[in-house]
Curated annotation (Swiss-Prot):
EC number: 1.1.1.-
Name under which the protein is recorded: WW domain-containing oxidoreductase
Localization per Swiss-Prot or TrEMBL: Cytoplasm; Nucleus; Mitochondrion; Golgi apparatus
Binding-site residues, NADP(+): 131-137
One MF annotation (Gene Ontology) recorded for this entry: enzyme binding
Keywords: Apoptosis, Cytoplasm, Golgi apparatus, Lysosome, Mitochondrion, NADP, Nucleus, Oxidoreductase, Phosphoprotein, Repeat, Tumor suppressor, Ubl conjugation, Wnt signaling pathway
SUPFAM superfamilies, A to Z: NAD(P)-binding Rossmann-fold domains (SSF51735), WW domain (SSF51045)
Species classification: Eukaryota, Metazoa, Chordata, Craniata, Vertebrata
Domain of life: Eukaryota
Major localisation: cytoplasm
Length: 414
């Protein structure tokens, strides 16, 4: 009954609880009215609050509105094969008072990805999520799959990715979801993934650069670069380069780059203010795992901003997001310090569904159509660090990334 639960039918709101003998109904065009069975009359105003309401958005995925022979509206849940006269959107009504000012944002840190997608149907949309076999990436992929999107889980370990696909299919057997191999630590693997993806001849409407590594001991990839830098930044940079033609053909399309608030606690320029490769991919003697992670997260925002500047004229936007503080996931398995900190902070952390919310919000919010080059935290735009806002550093990082790839593979494919 997962789809029914996600539709909101289990939710109640004590403030809007009706008196005995009253029933809440909706019209064909979404207006809420109230039936008083005791006095056999109807009215637009809630009998307790006096408010007028309407349902928000489309019906949840898998639902259809029909009318019976008496002209009464009813609803068919095709996923769970049930019929009801209760509009599933009634759990998400909004006040009919558009002129009343409000300072409350629609979503916040407690919002889940499923709540953001409630009532949305993404049939025909293709979503690619890297690192989607667990954690935030899995919740992002699952949320889209349960709302009709064709979702591709791009992961280093195909076996674990296939297990993640099975978990999604257990929730809804008709979900359109598949796994593909992508190792961001190997540039040739990124290239092979892009070739395999293009061979499918599908569109690409949302690309979520989610995969990442944290607290690794110093090491070099097969391409001769420090692992954290290549996995968290350069691999994603190359992936987007290879798929940018597909994104542009699929426009409007969106790229979401998962960064972190830790980007604020580092810098990647030398004393003269120039981008310094030795800070991005340091030798063993200068390596500190936490600093390497922070620098890669700064690269994420700079990359997202420059990507938006270059591709937005072609209908592709990009935004960077912070998923949440002290969220334990598989990327932290290498750090005993982080495990200890997480154990202490766990009562105050987000769930993985909440952690995926900002990513999903930036991927689907109608108010962000055509907008990008921004940084979001708790589904709200906020300013990143001053260095993350530097257009000069963003351009320099882009050019350096292109050179690093070209030096190893030759001219990038497209």
């Amino acid at each position: 009954m997962a789809a029914l639960r996600y539709a909101g039918l289990d939710d109640t709101d004590s403030e809007d609880e009706l008196p005995p003998g009253w029933e809440e109904r909706t019209t064909k065009d979404g207006w809420v009215y109230y039936a008083n069975h005791t006095e056999e009359k109807t009215q637009w105003e809630h009998p307790k609050t006096g408010k007028r309401k309407r349902v928000a958005g489309d019906l949840p995925y898998g639902w259809e509105q029909e009318t019976d022979e008496n002209g009464q509206v009813f609803f068919v849940d095709h996923i769970n094969k049930r019929t009801t006269y209760l509009d599933p959107r009634l759990a998400f009504t909004v006040d009919d008072n558009p002129t009343k000012p409000t300072t409350r944002q629609r979503y916040d840190g407690s919002t889940t990805a499923m709540e953001i997608l409630q009532g949305r149907d993404f049939t025909g949309k293709v979503v690619l999520v890297t690192g989607a076999n667990s954690g935030i990436g899995f919740e992002t992929a699952k949320s889209f799959a349960l709302h009709g999107a064709h979702v591709i889980l791009a992961c280093r370990n195909l076996s674990r990715a296939s297990e993640a696909v099975s978990r999604i299919l257990e929730e809804w057997h008709k979900a359109k979801v598949e796994a593909m191999t992508l190792d961001l630590a190997v540039l040739r693997s990124v290239q092979h993934f892009a070739e395999a993806f293009k061979a499918k001849n599908v569109s690409l409407h949302v690309l979520v650069c989610n995969a990442g590594t944290f607290a690794l001991p110093w090491g070099l990839t097969k391409d001769g670069l420090e692992t954290t830098f290549q996995v968290n930044h350069l691999g994603h940079f190359y992936l987007v380069q290879l798929l940018q033609d597909v994104l542009c053909r699929s426009s409007p399309a969106r790229v979401i780059v998962v960064s972190s608030e830790s980007h604020r606690f580092t810098d990647i320029n030398d004393s003269s203010g120039k981008l310094d490769l030795s800070r991005l991919s340091p030798p063993r003697s200068d390596y500190w795992a936490m600093l390497a992670y922070n620098r890669s997260k700064l690269c994420n925002i700079l990359f997202s901003n420059e990507l938006h500047r270059r591709l937005s004229p072609r209908g592709v936007t990009s935004n960077a997001v912070h998923p949440g503080n002290m969220m334990y996931s598989a990327i932290h398995r290498n750090s005993w310090v982080y495990k200890l900190l997480f154990t202490l902070a766990r009562p105050f952390t987000k769930s993985m569904q909440q952690g995926a919310a900002t990513t999903v919000y930036c991927a689907v919010a109608p108010e962000l159509e055509g907008l990008g080059g921004m940084y979001f935290n708790n589904c709200c735009r906020c300013l990143p660090s001053e260095e993350a806002q530097s257009e000069e550093t963003a351009r320099a990082l882009w050019e350096l990334s292109e050179r690093l790839i070209q030096d190893r593979l030759g001219s990038p494919s497209s």
